[in-house]
Amino acid sequence: MSARTKARKRALDVLYVADIRGESIPATLAVEQQRAAAEPDRQASWAYAREIAEGFVEHQDEIDELIETYSVNWTLARMPAVDRAILRIGIWEILFNADVPDGVAISESVDLASSLSTDESASFVNGMLARIAAAQA
């Protein structure tokens, strides 16, 4: 597993935990940063995980508005928390990280959905992110 793939998973953990616990993302990031500092093998992926989470916080309103706009018959509040977190990461990478090709952002998000969410989530995430990427092109 590449360092960026691990970082996406760590960012997903941060967004998911903050969402489920009703905590702020910066507070959850602070806890994770302490954990990463204590475990050298986590430090390689930590910088990009933090960049993703902080980037989402900076652009949360825009990202969540896109999710609401492009999700058919699913409000943000109604979708599973893990799917919300995956979509937020994928959209942030598509819109705000020029170093990651859209196809890679979509593929990595679909892989996360396949391994961590429902059977239908991977195709839902794929369709949503593909439509958003196409609209931004």
Curated annotation (Swiss-Prot):
- GO terms of biological process kind: DNA-templated transcription termination; transcription antitermination
Q: Which family does it belong to?
A: Belongs to the NusB family.
Task: Check the record and name the Gene3D superfamilies matching this protein.
Answer: NusB-like
Protein encoded by which gene: nusB
Concerning Pfam families, the annotation shows: NusB
List the residue ranges forming a coiled coil, or say none. none
Q: This chain belongs to which protein, by name?
A: Transcription antitermination protein NusB
GO MF annotation, one: RNA binding
InterPro entries per the UniProt record, alphabetical: NusB-like_sf (IPR035926), NusB_fam (IPR011605), NusB_RsmB_TIM44 (IPR006027)
Please describe what this protein does: Involved in transcription antitermination. Required for transcription of ribosomal RNA (rRNA) genes. Binds specifically to the boxA antiterminator sequence of the ribosomal RNA (rrn) operons.
